[in-house]
Amino acid sequence: MADINLKGMGVALITPFKEDESVDYEALGKLVDYQVQNGTDYLVVLGTTAETPTLTEEEKKNIISLVVTRVRGRIPIVLGVGGNCTRSVVEKLKTDNFEGIDAILSVVPYYNKPSQEGIYQHYKAIANATHLPIVLYNVPGRTGVNMTAETTLRIAREFDNVIAVKEASGNITQMDDIIKNKPARFNVISGDDGITFPLMTLGAVGVISVIGNAFPREFSRMVRLALAGDYDSARTIHHSFTELFSLLFVDGNPAGAKSMLNMMGFIENKLRLPLVPTRIVTYEKIREVLRQLSIKC
């Protein structure tokens, strides 16, 4: 198993689309460069923010190839590999080409709402199917089921290649329970930009960020300051983004992030159905906040 450190700010990359809704690979390449050059510690490819369920298998392969080629080993790449059919996920892990991939992010099975034992058995099968480091992903607002602290810790203790959990349950008490009782080699990563700072004061090691798509330099600085224990300086940056945290998700993710990147000139403001762009009122509110942050748009 490769030695990988996912402390700091990872960015869950969006997938840019052209006006005809084809993937804008040129824009994606520029976004990757923007991330690498502005302090992002690692990239997460084909996660929720990438609109992955709307992508074809060919598009997914092309995106992975582009990101790996563009990054050139400068920062780690984490690939989203998950699903609600354990057998299919295991088969994918055994047969796909993972050259250039440093770890995988695997979401709790969604829709079919497994029990805690089912979640454990799912991740056991995944851990036994790959040599790659695994980041668990708990996001009950999307999956319909919460992976409890007890289950998370059970998996963390039993499988050495399970190295972290991306926690997006919104339950600070649950996250703190994991932080207090986890193995030393296992880390908790925030899955929510808005609670990253408070969670890091409890011992989380960073975030897989959405807002970092637009603000990699600023948000990664906040994370580094928090890791260094400079909570006063980190708090100041956190507070500067407070209004934007909520605005980005008013009309769903990644609609808010794409609105920001559109205003900043990176991408077309296109999503694939069933997702749609932010409402005009939300778009204008985001624009006003960006102006207050002195971002040209």
Curated annotation (Swiss-Prot):
Transmembrane segments: none
Residues at the site labelled Part of a proton relay during catalysis: 48, 111
Keywords: Amino-acid biosynthesis, Cytoplasm, Diaminopimelate biosynthesis, Lyase, Lysine biosynthesis, Schiff base
PROSITE patterns: DHDPS_2 (PS00666)
Disulfide bond annotation, renumbered to this chain: none
UniProt keyword Nucleus, yes or no: no
N-terminal signal peptide: none
Record's catalysed reaction(s): L-aspartate 4-semialdehyde + pyruvate = (2S,4S)-4-hydroxy-2,3,4,5-tetrahydrodipicolinate + H2O + H(+)
GO CC annotation: cytosol
Residues of the active site: 137, 166
Primary localization class, coarse: cytoplasm
GO biological process entries: diaminopimelate biosynthetic process; lysine biosynthetic process via diaminopimelate
Positions of pyruvate binding: 49, 208
Subunit structure: Homotetramer; dimer of dimers.
Family (UniProt): Belongs to the DapA family.
Protein name: 4-hydroxy-tetrahydrodipicolinate synthase
Gene encoding the protein: dapA
